């Protein structure tokens, strides 16, 4: 031992120190040899950070050592990129380090290509997945590999960061979850969250930190009550607060539609006992202190989740009437909950020095339900593609399997209804669905399906049959939601098309104009192109939906025919939305001067709403006035085609000048958000002209405010004031046409 310690490479000392705590008799010479080979093979390679590439496999090995993995796994981790990224062959690696290490390295290499989408030969996939299920260390290495990559992701280009973060959320984090590796899963999710939604992440962090003092006081009170009662009941246990995970908080805000203040996970405790019987006794103690909430007790000790996770969960009405989540488990169960399948690798008991897995360890792994399911799928799948699809589904969401009357299997998300089933069969079957029979009995269309049920749907033969708007309230599958939404969007477009045609006819007749001469295919196509619509039908639809007014289109048609004098000015301002309110000005002073032409009439263009500080240009209108635009106005290119009409203009604001400003506010939706933002604006003494807010499906509120202000230099202070409103993660100026 002493000799071995003295010859260990200093770079490996941290890894060796952690590994020795669990495996004091581990053979460290093979670790040393693996590091030397990896260091030599990666010698000419650098990470994106500029660090030597060897730092990556070394970091992965350290993560696995902290998880308690065996020596063989650490060796494979050190070598896991050599076959793919260097000239080192799998045959040479296997000959030097043995079949077990070779199998692990080969599995990690193939898993990279398969699960994340690259092509691979069918039978190779089947063999690799089978081996993966029989030796889950392949999966554990892959998860650790991605964890280190996510920790160092800041050195990659933003688009690659986003792609990797999405892969991590969709595949790797769920994989860690299925392996029971909770601590790794949470870190992967939070790292991905910070990359994909940085502003939302920062706002959640800020909100959690803001509640920390009151939360800590509350938890201290709860912990003291539990500890005192457990001690009085002679139950030996440790009580601790549970860590907060930002992605989990954000998901609950979205999926359950909760405000931040209503999320139970912010207040939770964990009780760690010595014996299983003490866990059940501790539940009794907790329920004697506070009223349990109905339906919130889960016994994962008797029925382990995924065959790995064991714990008792309960939610009670705690002090001050707040929901309190409590987890109760033994210390061994907690180690498994944190490290999952990795916690089973205590090879000092399960494995001999010859590197062979003992039968008792193999049986322990085989008890894991998800691993058995992988092997079952491998046996049943007709081809590797079918098998891989099953794996992808299982990683993504909880699924149920139901049958058609002919015995075909349909996979659906948990909570699906006969309508989801109908759309899974075919889009037209979904659209025409009018009833359903489950296991031979008629059921309501909103009835939730369960595993193994036989579902039959009835369809309408009416030519105008279509979905009901009510279905949107209970379908859960993405396919059904998308198809129903597309149906009604198409229906609305058709109605808007006819409405738009009628509006155009009324507007032309109101002006006493020749309808046939003015509104024809050629002239309307020209205006559609000018207004950036795909075709004439799209233009009519936009009119019917109120995106552009019929009056504006008629004015453009007149300009095409050389009609009214102000046609070109209308062209310059065609992007002004019909809903933008007019500015009630108390003065004609727009704060702009024209060098060499004092007293000339000027006005600020509505399409880009310039304010002092913006770079501007003047455009001489047909009436002799000057329209002032930002140089980055959406209409700048068309204006500059008439260079003779572009003139210099300068800002010259006076105390009486008033400017129109529009801002967009993005925030995590909550009760009274609009009221609080409006109050912040009012406190800044601006005259609010209009406000609108829309809320997306992911609980993000997008608000638009248009207001008048005298001194735009004050805008930065105003934006900061709005940004300080709770839940707001971004606020910025937009043009009125944006």
Swiss-Prot record:
Record: residues binding Mg(2+): 265
Impact after mutating residue 81 to A: Loss of hydrolytic activity
Region listing for Disordered, in residue ranges: 568-592
Coiled coil ranges: none
Residues that hold Mn(2+) according to the record: 56, 80, 145
SUPFAM superfamilies registered for this protein in UniProt: ACT-like, HD-domain/PDEase-like, Nucleotidyltransferase, TGS-like
Outcome of substituting residue 80 to D: Loss of hydrolytic activity
Substitution effect: residue 344 to Y: Loss of ppGpp synthase activity
Protein name as annotated: Bifunctional (p)ppGpp synthase/hydrolase RelA
Organism in which the protein naturally occurs: Mycobacterium tuberculosis (strain ATCC 25618 / H37Rv)
Gene for this chain: relA
């Amino acid at each position: 031992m002493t000799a071995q310690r003295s010859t260990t490479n200093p770079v490996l000392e941290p890894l060796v120190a952690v590994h020795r705590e669990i495996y004091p008799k581990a053979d460290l010479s093979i670790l040393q040899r693996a590091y030397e080979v990896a260091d030599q093979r990666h010698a000419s390679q650098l990470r994106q950070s500029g660090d030597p590439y060897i730092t990556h496999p070394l970091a992965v090995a350290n993560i696995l050592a902290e998880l308690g993995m065996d020596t063989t796994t650490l060796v494979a981790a050190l070598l896991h990129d050599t076959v793919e990224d260097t000239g080192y062959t799998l045959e040479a690696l296997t000959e030097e380090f043995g079949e077990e290490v070779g199998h692990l390295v080969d599995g990690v290499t193939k898993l990279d290509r398969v699960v994340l989408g690259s092509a691979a030969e069918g039978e190779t996939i089947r063999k690799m997945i089978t081996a993966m299920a029989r030796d889950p260390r392949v999966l554990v290495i892959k998860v650790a590999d991605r964890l280190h990559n996510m920790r160092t992701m800041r050195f990659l280009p933003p688009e690659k960061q986003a792609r990797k973060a999405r892969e991590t959320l969709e595949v790797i984090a769920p994989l860690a979850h299925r392996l029971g590796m909770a601590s790794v899963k949470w870190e992967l999710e939070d790292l991905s969250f910070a990359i994909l939604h940085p502003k939302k992440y920062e706002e959640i962090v800020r909100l959690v930190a803001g509640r920390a003092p009151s939360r800590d006081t509350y938890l201290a009170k709860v912990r003291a009550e539990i500890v005192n009662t457990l001690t009085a009941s002679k139950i030996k246990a440790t009580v601790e607060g549970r860590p907060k995970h930002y992605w989990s908080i954000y998901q609950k805000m979205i999926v359950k539609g909760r405000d931040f203040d209503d999320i139970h996970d912010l207040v939770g405790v964990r009780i760690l006992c010595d014996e299983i019987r003490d866990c059940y006794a501790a539940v009794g103690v907790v329920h004697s202190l506070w009223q349990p909430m109905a339906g919130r007790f889960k016994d994962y000790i008797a029925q382990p989740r995924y065959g790995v996770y064991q714990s008792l969960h309960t939610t009670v009405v705690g002090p001050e009437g707040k929901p309190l989540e409590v987890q109760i488990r033994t210390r061994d169960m907690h180690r498994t909950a944190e490290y999952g399948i990795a916690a089973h690798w205590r090879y000092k008991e399960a494995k001999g020095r010859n590197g062979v897995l003992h039968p008792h360890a193999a049986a322990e792994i085989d008890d894991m339900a998800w691993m058995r399911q992988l092997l079952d799928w491998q046996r049943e799948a007709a081809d590797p593609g079918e098998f891989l699809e099953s794996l992808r589904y299982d990683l993504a969401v909880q699924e149920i399997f139901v049958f058609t009357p002919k015995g075909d299997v349909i996979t659906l998300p948990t909570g699906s209804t006969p309508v989801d089933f109908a759309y899974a069969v075919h889009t037209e079957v979904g659209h025409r669905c009018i009833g359903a029979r489950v296991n031979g009995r008629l059921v309501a269309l909103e009835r939730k399906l369960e595993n193994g049920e036989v579902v039959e749907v009835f369809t309408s033969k009416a030519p105008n049959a279509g979905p009901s708007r009510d279905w949107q309230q209970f379908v859960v599958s993405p396919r059904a939601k998308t198809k129903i939404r597309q149906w009604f969007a198409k229906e609305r477009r058709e109605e808007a098309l006819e409405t738009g045609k009628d509006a155009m006819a009324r507007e032309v007749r109101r002006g006493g104009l020749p309808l046939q001469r003015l509104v024809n295919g050629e002239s309307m196509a020209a205006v559609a192109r000018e207004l950036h619509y795909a075709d004439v039908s799209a233009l009519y639809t936009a009119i019917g939906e109120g995106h552009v007014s019929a009056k504006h289109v008629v004015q453009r048609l007149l300009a095409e025919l050389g009609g009214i004098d102000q046609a070109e000015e209308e062209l310059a301002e065609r992007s002004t939305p019909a809903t933008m309110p007019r500015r009630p000005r108390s003065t004609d002073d727009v704060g702009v001067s024209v060098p060499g032409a004092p007293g000339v009439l000027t006005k600020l263009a509505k399409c880009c709403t310039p304010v002092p500080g913006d770079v501007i240009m003047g455009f001489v209108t047909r009436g002799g006035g000057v329209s002032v635009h930002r140089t980055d106005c959406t209409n700048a290119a068309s204006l500059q085609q008439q260079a003779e009409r572009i003139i210099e203009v300068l800002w010259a604001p006076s105390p009486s000048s008033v400017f129109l400003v529009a801002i967009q506010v993005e925030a995590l939706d909550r009760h009274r958000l609009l009221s609080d933002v409006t109050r912040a604006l009012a406190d800044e003494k601006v005259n609010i002209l209009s406000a609108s807010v829309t809320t997306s499906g992911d609980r993000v509120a997008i608000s638009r405010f248009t207001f008048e202000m005298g001194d735009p230099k004050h805008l930065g202070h105003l934006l900061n004031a709005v940004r300080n409103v709770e839940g707001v993660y971004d606020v910025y100026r937009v043009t009125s046409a944006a």
